[in-house]
């Protein structure tokens, strides 16, 4: 939340005389959707990438027979006696016993985010205008990507249930609320903005799963660590596919891609699970995010590093040909954002340290862990 407020407050470079001025700062949020919807790549240019997607994006998907499946990491009642099954579940309980409540909050938040996959598939399909049975490379990518992603929430949900550490009815309610609430990520119907947003979110999903894997291993649950690590590896592979796609789109239409990049950065783009609700806590996503920030699962600093990564991957500062005056102006803007974010991260860290040292500690109850309180 703090990050997006800072980005909105960060001004675009001053325009030269005669150039179209930037929208007034006070009206930017109101006019953001209209501005984003104006960043279009032509259908001719977009469809010219069909062959490229076939040979450079679909290759990031794995054949089903070579993919891990959730059952590979769960007790199998069809092959175990009742006593053996009980022993297997007790082993999971024992491994999970030392994991702190704050880590479980992050595990559940990550899993709930994964379980809202129907919303994400609908978002990408609506941006691309695909069909459920289409045969274009784009249609096949959406379905293949979604099929791989589906295993993530499935496995995490089942394993977390078996730990016995969670109020699964509250977790299940949270999932239903989140899918039912939909999502407005602030990218309008722009293909370019949609893909840039997805690049950030795939990488932003990889980071917390990798960090929860590290925490699970530290606290003795090597199986849960492996599960989180496998999910992180999938997310990293998917992020690489979308990153490669945007690199190609910057080649095909550098000006519109640059404008889209700036719009996504300056708009108050929401996180996928920002409408998270458990029927009790109206600020559940904020509280979950606070815990993630506190224990280092996902931080403002991670976001800053992501932006640095994409600026280098897409070689943003080196793009010269094909940019309009407005394109060059927003290029300067996005190249200056990492420094803005670093300063924001430093200020946020300073505030957290002061809060720790001054006044009473702040605790938040989470229904997912039977209303036990977690310090934030």
Curated annotation (Swiss-Prot):
Pfam families, per database record: FA_desaturase_2
UniProt KW keywords: Chloroplast, Fatty acid biosynthesis, Fatty acid metabolism, Iron, Lipid biosynthesis, Lipid metabolism, Metal-binding, Oxidoreductase, Plastid, Transit peptide
Involved pathway(s): Lipid metabolism; fatty acid metabolism
MF terms in GO: metal ion binding; stearoyl-[ACP] desaturase activity
Enzyme class label: oxidoreductase
CDD domains from the UniProt entry: Acyl_ACP_Desat
Cofactor note: Binds 2 Fe(2+) ions per subunit.
Cellular compartment(s): Plastid, Chloroplast stroma
Required cofactor names: Fe(2+)
Binding site residues for Fe cation 1: 114, 149, 152, 235
Record GO biological process: fatty acid biosynthetic process
FT transit peptide: 1-33
GO cellular component: chloroplast stroma
Catalytic activity: hexadecanoyl-[ACP] + 2 reduced [2Fe-2S]-[ferredoxin] + O2 + 2 H(+) = (4Z)-hexadecenoyl-[ACP] + 2 oxidized [2Fe-2S]-[ferredoxin] + 2 H2O; octadecanoyl-[ACP] + 2 reduced [2Fe-2S]-[ferredoxin] + O2 + 2 H(+) = (9Z)-octadecenoyl-[ACP] + 2 oxidized [2Fe-2S]-[ferredoxin] + 2 H2O
Subunit composition and interactions: Homodimer.
Job of this protein: Converts stearoyl-ACP to oleoyl-ACP by introduction of a cis double bond between carbons 9 and 10 of the acyl chain. Converts palmitoyl-ACP to (4Z)-hexadec-4-enoyl-ACP by introduction of a cis double bond between carbons 4 and 5 of the acyl chain. Catalyzes the desaturation of saturated fatty acid 18:0 and 16:0 to generate 18:1 (delta-9) and 16:1 (delta-4) intermediates, expected to give rise to 9-alkenes and 12-alkenes, respectively.
Name under which the protein is recorded: Palmitoyl-[acyl-carrier-protein] 4-desaturase 2, chloroplastic
Record organism: Ophrys arachnitiformis subsp. archipelagi
